[in-house]
Amino acid sequence: MSRKPRVLSRPMAWRNAVNGVLQQLTGYQLRRGPVPAPRTAPQPDATKPSAAGRAAVKAPAVKPAAAKRAVVKPVAAKPPPQFPADYDDEAKDILRAVKPYTMTSPERLNAFVLATRHIVRHDIPGAVVECGVWRGGSMQACARTLLSLGEKDRDLYLFDTYEGMTPPTAEDLRRDGRSAQELLDAQGKDRPIWAVASLEDVKEGFAGVPYPEERVHYVRGKVEDTVPGQAPEQIAILRLDTDWYASTRHELEHLYGRLVSGGVLLIDDYGYWQGSRQAVDEFLERTGERLLLLRMDEGRIAVKP
Protein backbone atom coordinates (compact mmCIF):
# COMPACT_ATOMS: atom_id res chain seq x y z
CA MET A 1 0.00 0.00 0.00
CA SER A 2 1.48 3.28 -0.95
CA ARG A 3 1.52 6.22 1.44
CA LYS A 4 -0.29 9.37 0.67
CA PRO A 5 1.92 12.42 0.53
CA ARG A 6 1.71 14.55 3.76
CA VAL A 7 -0.01 17.79 3.11
CA LEU A 8 1.20 20.61 5.34
CA SER A 9 -1.06 23.37 6.47
CA ARG A 10 -0.14 26.86 5.52
CA PRO A 11 0.98 27.86 9.03
CA MET A 12 3.14 24.79 9.32
CA ALA A 13 4.63 25.32 5.84
CA TRP A 14 5.40 28.89 6.72
CA ARG A 15 7.02 27.82 9.99
CA ASN A 16 9.19 25.23 8.25
CA ALA A 17 10.33 27.77 5.69
CA VAL A 18 11.23 30.25 8.40
CA ASN A 19 13.01 27.60 10.48
CA GLY A 20 15.03 26.54 7.42
CA VAL A 21 16.32 30.04 6.84
CA LEU A 22 16.85 30.59 10.63
CA GLN A 23 18.74 27.30 10.86
CA GLN A 24 21.11 28.34 8.10
CA LEU A 25 21.74 31.79 9.56
CA THR A 26 21.82 31.13 13.38
CA GLY A 27 21.68 27.42 13.97
CA TYR A 28 18.42 27.85 15.94
CA GLN A 29 14.84 26.96 15.14
CA LEU A 30 11.50 28.13 16.50
CA ARG A 31 9.75 25.51 18.63
CA ARG A 32 6.21 25.68 19.94
CA GLY A 33 6.07 24.98 23.68
CA PRO A 34 3.39 25.01 26.39
CA VAL A 35 2.19 28.44 27.45
CA PRO A 36 3.00 28.98 31.15
CA ALA A 37 0.18 29.91 33.50
CA PRO A 38 0.14 33.54 34.69
CA ARG A 39 2.13 34.09 37.87
CA THR A 40 -0.03 34.85 40.90
CA ALA A 41 0.59 35.05 44.66
CA PRO A 42 0.79 31.60 46.24
CA GLN A 43 -2.39 30.54 47.96
CA PRO A 44 -2.19 29.20 51.52
CA ASP A 45 -2.50 25.49 51.96
CA ALA A 46 -5.69 24.83 53.89
CA THR A 47 -4.05 21.81 55.48
CA LYS A 48 -1.23 23.89 56.99
CA PRO A 49 -1.67 26.66 59.59
CA SER A 50 -0.81 30.19 58.58
CA ALA A 51 1.86 32.26 60.34
CA ALA A 52 -0.83 33.86 62.48
CA GLY A 53 -2.27 30.45 63.15
CA ARG A 54 1.16 29.10 64.07
CA ALA A 55 1.59 32.02 66.46
CA ALA A 56 -1.78 31.27 67.97
CA VAL A 57 -0.82 27.62 68.36
CA LYS A 58 2.48 28.54 69.96
CA ALA A 59 0.87 31.08 72.33
CA PRO A 60 -2.41 29.64 73.54
CA ALA A 61 -4.88 32.03 75.08
CA VAL A 62 -4.48 32.48 78.83
CA LYS A 63 -7.40 31.15 80.75
CA PRO A 64 -9.15 33.72 82.97
CA ALA A 65 -8.29 31.82 86.11
CA ALA A 66 -4.63 31.64 85.12
CA ALA A 67 -4.58 35.35 84.35
CA LYS A 68 -6.05 36.11 87.73
CA ARG A 69 -3.49 33.95 89.45
CA ALA A 70 -0.72 35.71 87.58
CA VAL A 71 -1.55 39.14 88.99
CA VAL A 72 -2.54 38.22 92.54
CA LYS A 73 0.25 39.02 94.98
CA PRO A 74 0.42 37.60 98.49
CA VAL A 75 -0.19 40.13 101.26
CA ALA A 76 2.86 40.37 103.47
CA ALA A 77 2.35 40.10 107.19
CA LYS A 78 2.35 43.46 108.96
CA PRO A 79 5.84 44.00 110.36
CA PRO A 80 6.25 44.53 114.09
CA PRO A 81 6.56 48.17 115.20
CA GLN A 82 10.01 49.64 114.77
CA PHE A 83 11.47 51.54 117.71
CA PRO A 84 14.32 54.05 117.84
CA ALA A 85 17.71 52.49 118.50
CA ASP A 86 18.01 54.07 121.96
CA TYR A 87 14.90 52.33 123.34
CA ASP A 88 16.06 49.58 125.69
CA ASP A 89 14.78 46.02 125.33
CA GLU A 90 12.66 46.15 128.48
CA ALA A 91 10.85 49.28 127.28
CA LYS A 92 10.29 47.70 123.87
CA ASP A 93 8.74 44.61 125.49
CA ILE A 94 6.41 46.81 127.55
CA LEU A 95 5.35 48.85 124.53
CA ARG A 96 4.59 45.70 122.54
CA ALA A 97 2.56 44.23 125.40
CA VAL A 98 0.28 47.27 125.80
CA LYS A 99 -0.12 48.13 122.11
CA PRO A 100 -3.63 46.56 121.76
CA TYR A 101 -4.89 48.72 124.63
CA THR A 102 -3.68 52.18 123.67
CA MET A 103 -3.65 54.85 120.98
CA THR A 104 -0.64 56.52 122.61
CA SER A 105 2.37 56.74 120.31
CA PRO A 106 5.56 54.78 121.09
CA GLU A 107 7.42 58.02 121.87
CA ARG A 108 4.86 59.13 124.44
CA LEU A 109 4.62 55.64 125.92
CA ASN A 110 8.39 55.48 126.25
CA ALA A 111 8.31 58.86 127.99
CA PHE A 112 5.79 57.42 130.48
CA VAL A 113 8.11 54.45 131.09
CA LEU A 114 11.06 56.81 131.67
CA ALA A 115 8.97 59.01 133.99
CA THR A 116 8.02 55.95 136.04
CA ARG A 117 11.66 54.91 136.35
CA HIS A 118 12.49 58.48 137.36
CA ILE A 119 10.10 58.59 140.32
CA VAL A 120 11.27 55.19 141.58
CA ARG A 121 14.97 55.95 141.17
CA HIS A 122 14.67 59.28 142.98
CA ASP A 123 12.12 58.17 145.60
CA ILE A 124 9.54 60.70 144.44
CA PRO A 125 6.47 60.16 146.65
CA GLY A 126 2.89 60.10 145.46
CA ALA A 127 0.46 58.29 143.21
CA VAL A 128 0.33 58.06 139.44
CA VAL A 129 -2.73 59.86 138.06
CA GLU A 130 -4.04 59.61 134.51
CA CYS A 131 -7.01 61.61 133.24
CA GLY A 132 -8.41 60.03 130.07
CA VAL A 133 -7.41 56.38 129.85
CA TRP A 134 -9.34 54.83 126.91
CA ARG A 135 -8.57 51.08 127.25
CA GLY A 136 -5.91 51.58 129.91
CA GLY A 137 -2.82 50.74 127.88
CA SER A 138 -0.77 53.74 129.01
CA MET A 139 -1.33 52.99 132.68
CA GLN A 140 -0.59 49.34 131.97
CA ALA A 141 2.82 50.48 130.72
CA CYS A 142 3.36 52.32 134.00
CA ALA A 143 2.27 49.29 136.06
CA ARG A 144 4.53 46.94 134.09
CA THR A 145 7.45 49.32 134.61
CA LEU A 146 6.81 49.46 138.36
CA LEU A 147 6.72 45.67 138.48
CA SER A 148 10.02 45.45 136.59
CA LEU A 149 11.53 47.66 139.32
CA GLY A 150 10.06 45.57 142.12
CA GLU A 151 7.59 48.24 143.25
CA LYS A 152 4.01 47.23 144.04
CA ASP A 153 2.84 49.72 146.66
CA ARG A 154 2.23 52.82 144.54
CA ASP A 155 -1.38 53.80 143.90
CA LEU A 156 -2.60 54.19 140.32
CA TYR A 157 -5.63 56.39 139.55
CA LEU A 158 -7.51 56.09 136.26
CA PHE A 159 -10.01 58.95 135.72
CA ASP A 160 -12.38 58.55 132.78
CA THR A 161 -16.05 58.66 131.81
CA TYR A 162 -15.66 55.08 130.50
CA GLU A 163 -18.28 56.12 127.95
CA GLY A 164 -16.19 58.11 125.47
CA MET A 165 -15.52 61.79 124.89
CA THR A 166 -17.38 64.60 126.60
CA PRO A 167 -18.78 67.46 124.46
CA PRO A 168 -16.07 69.83 123.19
CA THR A 169 -16.28 73.62 123.26
CA ALA A 170 -15.48 76.34 120.74
CA GLU A 171 -11.81 76.30 121.78
CA ASP A 172 -11.43 72.69 120.72
CA LEU A 173 -9.98 72.74 117.23
CA ARG A 174 -7.65 70.24 115.68
CA ARG A 175 -4.20 71.54 114.76
CA ASP A 176 -5.45 72.14 111.18
CA GLY A 177 -8.27 74.35 112.47
CA ARG A 178 -11.14 71.88 112.07
CA SER A 179 -13.73 71.88 114.82
CA ALA A 180 -13.67 68.93 117.20
CA GLN A 181 -17.46 68.89 117.25
CA GLU A 182 -17.54 68.73 113.46
CA LEU A 183 -15.10 65.82 113.49
CA LEU A 184 -17.11 63.95 116.12
CA ASP A 185 -20.37 64.48 114.25
CA ALA A 186 -18.83 63.11 111.05
CA GLN A 187 -17.87 59.78 112.62
CA GLY A 188 -19.67 57.06 114.50
CA LYS A 189 -18.99 56.34 118.14
CA ASP A 190 -17.08 53.23 117.17
CA ARG A 191 -14.33 55.38 115.65
CA PRO A 192 -11.10 56.13 117.58
CA ILE A 193 -11.84 59.86 117.91
CA TRP A 194 -14.67 59.04 120.33
CA ALA A 195 -12.33 56.93 122.54
CA VAL A 196 -15.18 54.74 123.77
CA ALA A 197 -14.15 51.96 126.15
CA SER A 198 -16.15 50.51 129.01
CA LEU A 199 -14.90 50.11 132.56
CA GLU A 200 -15.22 46.34 132.14
CA ASP A 201 -12.97 46.47 129.08
CA VAL A 202 -10.30 48.42 130.96
CA LYS A 203 -10.41 46.05 133.92
CA GLU A 204 -10.18 43.06 131.62
CA GLY A 205 -7.03 44.49 130.07
CA PHE A 206 -5.50 45.06 133.49
CA ALA A 207 -6.24 41.46 134.44
CA GLY A 208 -3.19 40.46 132.41
CA VAL A 209 -0.92 42.71 134.50
CA PRO A 210 0.00 41.21 137.91
CA TYR A 211 -0.15 44.55 139.72
CA PRO A 212 -2.02 44.49 143.06
CA GLU A 213 -5.71 45.12 142.37
CA GLU A 214 -6.16 47.13 145.57
CA ARG A 215 -3.64 49.66 144.23
CA VAL A 216 -5.54 50.32 141.00
CA HIS A 217 -8.35 52.87 141.40
CA TYR A 218 -10.92 53.40 138.63
CA VAL A 219 -12.71 56.75 138.97
CA ARG A 220 -15.75 57.00 136.73
CA GLY A 221 -17.31 60.25 135.50
CA LYS A 222 -16.38 63.64 134.05
CA VAL A 223 -13.22 65.06 135.60
CA GLU A 224 -15.15 68.24 136.34
CA ASP A 225 -17.27 66.11 138.71
CA THR A 226 -14.66 63.73 140.17
CA VAL A 227 -11.63 66.04 140.49
CA PRO A 228 -10.43 67.05 143.03
CA GLY A 229 -12.80 65.15 145.33
CA GLN A 230 -11.59 61.65 144.43
CA ALA A 231 -7.98 62.52 143.62
CA PRO A 232 -4.99 61.64 145.86
CA GLU A 233 -3.26 64.35 147.90
CA GLN A 234 0.20 63.59 146.54
CA ILE A 235 0.91 62.96 142.88
CA ALA A 236 4.24 61.76 141.45
CA ILE A 237 3.14 61.56 137.80
CA LEU A 238 0.24 63.54 136.33
CA ARG A 239 -0.73 62.46 132.84
CA LEU A 240 -3.43 64.51 131.07
CA ASP A 241 -5.16 62.98 128.04
CA THR A 242 -8.73 64.27 127.97
CA ASP A 243 -8.03 66.34 124.83
CA TRP A 244 -10.40 69.26 125.40
CA TYR A 245 -9.83 72.77 126.69
CA ALA A 246 -12.30 72.73 129.59
CA SER A 247 -11.23 69.38 131.05
CA THR A 248 -7.49 70.13 130.71
CA ARG A 249 -7.90 73.51 132.37
CA HIS A 250 -9.87 71.92 135.24
CA GLU A 251 -7.23 69.21 135.75
CA LEU A 252 -4.37 71.70 135.88
CA GLU A 253 -6.19 74.02 138.26
CA HIS A 254 -7.00 71.26 140.75
CA LEU A 255 -4.24 68.67 140.34
CA TYR A 256 -1.04 70.48 139.40
CA GLY A 257 -0.76 71.83 142.95
CA ARG A 258 -0.73 68.22 144.20
CA LEU A 259 2.12 67.25 141.87
CA VAL A 260 5.18 67.07 144.12
CA SER A 261 8.53 68.68 143.40
CA GLY A 262 10.45 66.40 141.05
CA GLY A 263 7.18 64.91 139.82
CA VAL A 264 6.48 64.56 136.10
CA LEU A 265 3.75 66.26 134.06
CA LEU A 266 2.73 64.57 130.78
CA ILE A 267 0.35 66.36 128.40
CA ASP A 268 -0.67 64.02 125.61
CA ASP A 269 -2.39 66.34 123.11
CA TYR A 270 -0.57 69.66 123.46
CA GLY A 271 0.49 69.61 119.82
CA TYR A 272 -2.68 68.08 118.36
CA TRP A 273 -5.72 69.78 119.92
CA GLN A 274 -5.57 73.56 120.11
CA GLY A 275 -7.84 73.61 123.15
CA SER A 276 -5.44 71.45 125.15
CA ARG A 277 -2.54 73.73 124.26
CA GLN A 278 -4.51 76.86 125.08
CA ALA A 279 -5.45 75.52 128.51
CA VAL A 280 -1.81 74.72 129.33
CA ASP A 281 -0.44 78.02 128.03
CA GLU A 282 -3.06 80.03 129.93
CA PHE A 283 -2.34 78.11 133.14
CA LEU A 284 1.41 78.71 132.92
CA GLU A 285 0.87 82.38 132.09
CA ARG A 286 -1.54 82.85 134.97
CA THR A 287 0.52 81.02 137.60
CA GLY A 288 3.98 82.03 136.41
CA GLU A 289 5.08 78.40 136.71
CA ARG A 290 8.49 77.98 135.08
CA LEU A 291 8.12 74.75 133.20
CA LEU A 292 10.23 73.71 130.25
CA LEU A 293 7.82 71.70 128.09
CA LEU A 294 9.86 69.21 126.10
CA ARG A 295 8.40 67.70 122.96
CA MET A 296 7.47 64.02 122.76
CA ASP A 297 6.06 64.07 119.21
CA GLU A 298 2.63 65.72 119.63
CA GLY A 299 2.77 65.64 123.43
CA ARG A 300 4.81 67.52 126.03
CA ILE A 301 6.67 66.47 129.19
CA ALA A 302 8.06 68.50 132.10
CA VAL A 303 9.51 67.92 135.57
CA LYS A 304 8.06 70.15 138.27
CA PRO A 305 10.74 72.29 139.96
Predicted regions span which residues?
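Membrane-proximal basic amphipathic "stem/tether" segments
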Residues: 1-89
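Conserved pre-motif I regulatory segment
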Residues: 114
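S-adenosylmethionine/decaboxylated-SAM
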Residues: 80-106, 117, 122-305
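N-terminal pre-P-loop "Q-motif" helix
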Residues: 107-111
